[in-house]
Amino acid sequence: MAELTISTEEIRGALERYVSSYTADVSREEVGTVADAGDGIAHVEGLPSTMTNELLEFEDGTLGVALNLDVREIGVVVLGDFGGIEEGQRVKRTGRVLSAPVGDAFLGRVVNALGHPIDGLGDIANEGFRELELQAPNVMARKSVDEPLQTGIKAVDAMTPIGRGQRQLIIGDRKTGKTTVALDTILNQRDNWRSGDPKKQVRCIYVAVGQKASTIASIKGVLEEAGAMEYTTIVASPASDPAGFKYLAPYTGSTIGQHWMYGGKHVLVVFDDLSKQAEAYRAVSLLLRRPPGREAYPGDVFYLHSRLLERCAKLSDEMGGGSMTGLPIIETKANDISAFIPTNVISITDGQIFLETDLFNQGVRPAINVGTSVSRVGGAAQVKPMKKVAGSLRLNLAQYRELEAFAAFASDLDKASRAQLERGSRLVELLKQPNYSPFPVEEQVVSVWAGTEGRLDDIPVGEIRRFESEFLQYLRHKHEGVLAGIAAGTWGDEIIASLDAAISDFKNLFLGKEDEQRVNEPPAKPLAGEENRETVTRFRDGTTDRPAES
């Protein structure tokens, strides 16, 4: 019988091979339970290793984001339908921090606060994900604002110019045209986009927070009709969305824009509006049982907006030279810009455009209050011709408003004051502009030059806008080289002389045509009781003798 031999080396090798090839089928995951849920908020017990802003998954697949990390429980904002979440259900960690998909495929699309498409055009092929809570560029990564972002609005580009990388607040009561100013700015980027020049192209993001779904649909229709959706992304969180979505939507829009900014591209982001985001954040914070402060807002409501708007920047050449311009919108109550949220955002931004209800009701649109509107850094980026002609415009309008208020009570004014009132009324008329009809910068320069230099003083106030329209058309056909020179940034004696000659020639044609129309019009029949008004008026002006007494 053969002797049994045991080789320890073989046994050890067999065991090592078995152990090295073994794969455990058991997965490790942290699981917690829902302590209570309601109003879009859930309090979860357990999960001690959860990170701030980490995504958590409920039993029905709904996601939530961890905002409050207390010793015993976690405060979670539910991102979706919270009707199926009940006490006692299991919650597990995902290990992922809240992020949004980004990429060029988002242009022309409408997405929700999580970056998911809601326009029915299918999935979006993203280029990756970016965290929503990324640090803003530091001081060394930035450079000063030195490139203009033209809005196409004469009053804005002349008096409160905006530069690429600037944060310019649009503030005013409801129904004063705040959204219209922002949409005009988006529409004015169309020619730059179609030029194909990456240095001129501006990608636009419109963030709609707390608006009616029908309003968002109409805004999309305006952009599509003007051909602006091809370079615009809409991030929509309508009034029907939970408060958590309204709180996150501006960060999603900013994240999509940051992807392009760090890629060396230029971006414009409109936040419409941050008042509703602050209200949504207040609701979320109170439901999370955070201590309330002034007007029941949480103590970090300033940080809510500062960390969002600080992401707007003009990057240095070493960082690619991209930019992200922010146009936050804030709604005031009774024109009170000293309220809590308005003063917060005013202190964060680089200037504000204040739209006033009284001016809007008077037909001055855009209804910009010159006295309280300012741009702190955009002047450095203003084009040279506009800077030359618009220097006195703000002062003239401010003096006109002051004199207008005085003239309402004064019976007689000196000649200089009357002349100032006449010119001021023409400047106000000149700066009026229809909705969704932005002006090229060279035509803005011509209009502002004509008004500030007194070339319109002999044109009736009611005819100013018609004169402007026809004169610009005349220049486009007869003096195209002058407009091209201004567009190229040229301004000097030669261009001024050409404009002087052109406006004199056109004025003769315009006034001659007007006189001819007046002659051909049949005399208007006086209304009852007005037969003697002309005589009385002429007597008051001193142009006729006193009527004989009976």
From Swiss-Prot:
Pfam entry (one): ATP-synt_ab_C
Site feature location: Required for activity: 373
A GO molecular function held by the record: ADP binding
Keywords linked to the UniProt accession: ATP synthesis, ATP-binding, Cell membrane, CF(1), Hydrogen ion transport, Ion transport, Membrane, Nucleotide-binding, Translocase, Transport
Catalytically driven reaction(s): ATP + H2O + 4 H(+)(in) = ADP + phosphate + 5 H(+)(out)
Spans traversing the lipid bilayer: none
Cellular component terms per the entry's GO annotation: plasma membrane; proton-transporting ATP synthase complex
Family statement drawn from the similarity comment of this UniProt entry: Belongs to the ATPase alpha/beta chains family.
Name by which UniProt lists this protein: ATP synthase subunit alpha
Name of the coding gene: atpA
